Amino acid sequence: STLISSFANRSLDVADLVSLSGAHTFGVAHCPAFEDRSSRVRHNPAIDGKFATALRNKCSGDNPSGTLTQKLDVRTPDVFDNKYYFDLIARQGLFKSDQGLIDHPTTKRMATRFSLNQGAFFEQFARSMTKMSNMDILTGTKGEIRNNCAVPNRRVRTSRPPSPARGDRR
């Protein structure tokens, strides 16, 4: 419910939440980000036992600075598809927030639908991405279109034009 209200505060609805979470069909997470899912709890019905054991085995021991990672989608980690939702139904969601989609009555129906109908997932994902891409657009000097999203573009001075090169007759 916290995610539902967080999304609602940004004018995004439950369909947006469930479909945009499907982006977790790609990518990895560092072990510390999901250690709450793989902790040594005797029986945690919120996670598949074998999956929890595999996560625990992978992330325990020598893990300097949390460098070990786990793929977010255990079935098809390098394909954009609806198998992420199968992971959730099988109780193999890496994050609590992901697994919560199949456990919460408001989101369960849509997550299940996306597991059964990849086309419906793709259509809603496209609508939700478009909706999200139009939110809080920064223009002018407040924003920039980056060449590399992780690195701010180099700032260029525009206060005065560059001086002409020697021999240039402007």
Curated annotation (Swiss-Prot):
Binds 2 calcium ions per subunit. It catalyses: 2 a phenolic donor + H2O2 = 2 a phenolic radical donor + 2 H2O. GO terms for molecular function: heme binding; lactoperoxidase activity; metal ion binding. Its EC number is 1.11.1.7. Belongs to the peroxidase family. Classical plant (class III) peroxidase subfamily. PANTHER family: PEROXIDASE 55, PTHR31517. This is Peroxidase 2.
